[in-house]
Amino acid sequence: DMLEATHKDPQAGCAPKITLHCTHKNPDDAQIFDAIKADNEPTCLHLLSRVQDEIYDVLEEAPLYSVLEPIDISVDPNPKPQNLTVLVFGAGDFGMQATRTSFWMGRMPGVRLNIVVVDPNARTILEREAARYPEMFGESCNGMPTIRFVQAEAPSVTTDRLIAGGTVTTLHYDAQNKCVSSTADSAPITDDARLYAFVTMGDCGQNLSYSLMLQRQIFNRFIDQGSPDYTKQQPVICPHIESEE
């Protein structure tokens, strides 16, 4: 009724301007409302996404570039770009928002962005997301997809399996053939990767527990592999926690 009332023709000279703030979950909502927007309407619709706001807050508090070395933008092209690898465990609402936002915010000079999403329903989710954003999910650099999916339960995929030497089957969207392709990938995460992880598997306790396990695995990798100093690289792991307990 409120929406209907606000769309009645206002009296001349006293047209009210009403702003409606609505929460939403569907990432397509903004495009839908933009498409039906009419000129000279007395109402203004402002969409709010709790999921999007929370991911933005995380990336404002701990930006993606916090895991990188200082970037010298005066060098063009950069002789050896840094490898920013974003891990997303769980491809629900929060996980996919983290994936999309990381894709937008991870576009920095002198940086090679690599996003790996782990979920038991990876193929179905990738097909859905690629239909919405084919250019995003079909992007590749030197033949390497920017976004890849691993179809597995997150706890069963340790960082050892995702690092060079641990072969897993990865999925990516083939933009040319407009289909999802699978590849036996021996290095979803390279040894020189600067790691930033989101853990969004649903349950707060599970997210926290897996984040701690992931931190130990990454730390052990630095010790065992003789990789660059853990304290200098400072990987970032962001578990999704809703409970205040």
Predicted regions and their residues:
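Cytosolic regulatory regions of ion transport systems
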Residues: 1-245
